[in-house]
């Protein structure tokens, strides 16, 4: 994604309709690509925001009998006590931090960037935001969990993002990443960052997917945190 994996294509991008003064970087779920999410953001875009939907590298995934598929890091199991791919998660987070740095070089300050993702991508967006020294505007974490949660402190994190705004969304009928994981994650997040800035929304009948109401909530969150500045 950042020169370390030549087989990963360039991100799907929804360019700003005028000069970009803010950006959303959104990470897809396991086995997917950024294209579908770029289409979704094209439907809720604001003219001063650039939407960047990178594609994960293709790699074998333990959970899926070692079949190769787009994956930000290896997934060994989907229960809260499953072993985790610590080195893969940390390397993936470094790649996302490099992507943020690239946008800063392009003239968008990091505090005008929202990081987000769905499922595995949402997990990576949370982990990256909580471990980076880049001050971000917020995180939109959809149908996901916090990876390596035991590696975080018992109390608030230090660093740039202890007051970050987080919108976490989950379907109440999710069979893959159960709602309970979302609830446990939001409770943990409230101990790590200012709990007043953490919002948890659930969607009745929604499975491991998205819905129109959720995208409207995501748009409202983005537009509130990244207003036009000109």
Swiss-Prot record:
It holds the Pfam family Abhydrolase_2. Keywords: Acetylation, Cell membrane, Cytoplasm, Endoplasmic reticulum, Fatty acid metabolism, Hydrolase, Lipid metabolism, Membrane, Nucleus. The modification N6-acetyllysine is found at residue 224. Gene3D superfamilies: alpha/beta hydrolase. It is found in: Cytoplasm; Cell membrane; Nucleus membrane; Endoplasmic reticulum. Its EC number is 3.1.2.-, 3.1.2.22. InterPro entries: AB_hydrolase_fold (IPR029058), LYPA1-2/EST-like (IPR050565), PLipase/COase/thioEstase (IPR003140). It catalyses: S-hexadecanoyl-L-cysteinyl-[protein] + H2O = L-cysteinyl-[protein] + hexadecanoate + H(+); 1-hexadecanoyl-sn-glycero-3-phosphocholine + H2O = sn-glycerol 3-phosphocholine + hexadecanoate + H(+); a 1-(9Z-octadecenoyl)-2-acyl-sn-glycero-3-phosphocholine + H2O = a 2-acyl-sn-glycero-3-phosphocholine + (9Z)-octadecenoate + H(+). GO terms for molecular function: lysophospholipase activity; palmitoyl-(protein) hydrolase activity; phospholipase activity. GO terms for cellular component: cytoplasm; endoplasmic reticulum; nuclear membrane; plasma membrane. Coiled coil: none annotated. The active site is at residues 119, 174, 208. The keyword Hydrolase applies. Belongs to the AB hydrolase superfamily. AB hydrolase 2 family. Acts as an acyl-protein thioesterase. Hydrolyzes fatty acids from S-acylated cysteine residues in proteins such as trimeric G alpha proteins or HRAS. Acts as a palmitoyl thioesterase that catalyzes depalmitoylation of proteins, such as ADRB2, KCNMA1 and SQSTM1. Acts as a negative regulator of autophagy by mediating palmitoylation of SQSTM1, decreasing affinity between SQSTM1 and ATG8 proteins and recruitment of ubiquitinated cargo proteins to autophagosomes. Acts as a lysophospholipase and hydrolyzes lysophosphatidylcholine (lyso-PC). This is Acyl-protein thioesterase 1.
